[in-house]
Curated annotation (Swiss-Prot):
It holds the Pfam family GapR_DNA-bd. Belongs to the UPF0335 family. It comes from the Bacteria. It comes from Brucella anthropi (strain ATCC 49188 / DSM 6882 / CCUG 24695 / JCM 21032 / LMG 3331 / NBRC 15819 / NCTC 12168 / Alc 37) (Ochrobactrum anthropi). This is UPF0335 protein Oant_1161. GO terms for molecular function: DNA binding.
Length: 85
């Protein structure tokens, strides 16, 4: 391998190492955030709130209004078909 190829390989290895280290840092941050969310939900539960309902509301708030309405309509249709309403 000549000097140019060796330099290119070293540059690629350095770039790859940098990418991997960035992903590892982000994974650590994600784990820390997940623990923070767990703590907040534990606090809510301790204050008497239903954490399952809170998680459902958070999931629904992430959707736009049309998507949420469509999901609710389908759910109501299925529940009516099963005699649950």
């Amino acid at each position: 391998m000549d000097e140019i190829e060796s330099s290119a390989v070293n540059a690629a290895a350095s770039e790859l190492r940098s990418i991997i280290e960035r992903v590892e840092r982000l994974e650590e941050e994600k784990a820390a955030i997940a623990n923070d969310v767990k703590d907040v939900l534990g606090e809510a539960k301790g204050r008497g709130y239903d954490t399952k309902a809170i998680k459902t509301i958070i999931r629904l708030r992430k959707k736009d209004a049309n998507e949420r309405l469509e999901e609710e309509t389908i759910l109501q249709t299925y529940m009516a078909a099963l005699g649950m309403e």
